[in-house]
C-alpha cells in the first residue's frame, strides 16, 4: 500500500532535505527515472532508511530491448545504491520494440528479485491492454500519467479502465507546473476565484485543494515535485481530509474535462 502523496523528482535539485522532510510527513513513495538523472540524489537521501521507502524508477523508452532493460535496471540499482526497485516502470511506449520483448525482461527482473512490481507510464488504454496481454506471470500495477485540474483528458477512458482493472494511476504534474499552487500564478478568471473560495472554506492552500481533488478520483495517487522544504510540507498537507461534494462539484464546473 503506497501513500496517497509521493515525491516526484523530475528536474529535482533540492538535495536531501525536502525529500527527507516529505518522508517524515508520510510521503514515503519516491519516484525517479533514469532520464531524470536524479537517481543518485534519491539514493543519497534514502541511505540508511531504505526499508521505509517505496522506491520507483523508470527505464527510458529508448532502452526497451530485452538486454537494454536488464542493463538499465542494473545501472539504476547502482546509482541509487539499493538492491531492489519496488516499482519499475516503462517511461514511454516505443512502437519500434515489441511490447512482449520488454515485458519479458521486466518479468525476468521480478524473478531475479531485483524488482517487486511492474508499471508503465504515459500509456493509453490500448497500449496498457497490450502490455497486460504481453505479461505471462505478473500484473501491470500502475500507469503514471499527466493529471491535474487543468488536464483531465484521462477521465474519458483511462481512469475508468484503471479503476476497473485495479491499476493505480500515478498522477505527475498534479499542480500543473505550479500554476495551481497559489493565487498569484492562477489565471485571472473564474477558475482562480473558485480555487481561492474552496481553499478559504477548507482552511487549506490552493495547492492542497488541487492535490486533494486528484485524490478523490480513484485509483489516483499524486507525486508533486518541489525543491523546497516549505512546499513539501504544504503538499503533504493535502492528505488526511477530503473536499466536500459541493466543493468538488464547483471545482469540476470551473475546470471542465
Regions found by a protein language model. Give the residues of each.
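Short, acidic/polar
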Residues: 12-23, 65-80, 101, 126-129, ...
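Acidic (Asp/Glu)-rich catalytic clusters
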Residues: 21-23, 43-52, 74-82, 108-110, ...
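Acidic-and-aromatic substrate-binding clefts and catalytic sites of carbohydrate-active enzymes
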Residues: 12-15, 31-41, 62-67, 94-98, ...
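A short, structured active-site edge motif that brings together acidic residues
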Residues: 52-64, 87-91, 144-147
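Glycine-centered flexible beta-alpha turn that most often forms the glycine-rich phosphate-binding loop
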Residues: 7, 30, 85, 118, ...
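Beta/alpha (TIM)-barrel catalytic core signal, keyed to glycine-rich beta->alpha loops juxtaposed to Asp/Glu
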Residues: 93-257
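Active-site groove signature of glycoside hydrolases
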Residues: 80-97
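N-terminal binding-site loop/beta-alpha segment at the start of enzyme catalytic domains
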Residues: 1-53, 178, 256
Amino acid at each position: 500500500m503506497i501513500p496517497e502523496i509521493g515525491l516526484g523528482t523530475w528536474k529535482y535539485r533540492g538535495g536531501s532535505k525536502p525529500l527527507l522532510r516529505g518522508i517524515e510527513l508520510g510521503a514515503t513513495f519516491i519516484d525517479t527515472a533514469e532520464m531524470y538523472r536524479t537517481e543518485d540524489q534519491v539514493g543519497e537521501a534514502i541511505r540508511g532508511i531504505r526499508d521505509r521507502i517505496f522506491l520507483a524508477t523508470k527505464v527510458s523508452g529508448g532502452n526497451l530491448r530485452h538486454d537494454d532493460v536488464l542493463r538499465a535496471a542494473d545501472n539504476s540499482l547502482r546509482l541509487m545504491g539499493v538492491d531492489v526497485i519496488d516499482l519499475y516502470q516503462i517511461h514511454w511506449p516505443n512502437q519500434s520494440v515489441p511490447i512482449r520483448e520488454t515485458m519479458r525482461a521486466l518479468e525476468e527482473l521480478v524473478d531475479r528479485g531485483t524488482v517487486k512490481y511492474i508499471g508503465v507510464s504515459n500509456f493509453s488504454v490500448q497500449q496498457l491492454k497490450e502490455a497486460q496481454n504481453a505479461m505471462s506471470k505478473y500484473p501491470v500495477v500502475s500507469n503514471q500519467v499527466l493529471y491535474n485540474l487543468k488536464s483531465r483528458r484521462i477521465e474519458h477512458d483511462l481512469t475508468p479502465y484503471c479503476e476497473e482493472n485495479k491499476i493505480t494511476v500515478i498522477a505527475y504534474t498534479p499542480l500543473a507546473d505550479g500554476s495551481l499552487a497559489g493565487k498569484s500564478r492562477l489565471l485571472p478568471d473564474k477558475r482562480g476565484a473558485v480555487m481561492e473560495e474552496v481553499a478559504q472554506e477548507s482552511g487549506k492552500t490552493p495547492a492542497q485543494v488541487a492535490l486533494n481533488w486528484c485524490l478523490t478520483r480513484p485509483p489516483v495517487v499524486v507525486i508533486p515535485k518541489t525543491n523546497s522544504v516549505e512546499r513539501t510540507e504544504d503538499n503533504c498537507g493535502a492528505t488526511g481530509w477530503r473536499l466536500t461534494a459541493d466543493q468538488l462539484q464547483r471545482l469540476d464546473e470551473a475546470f471542465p474535462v
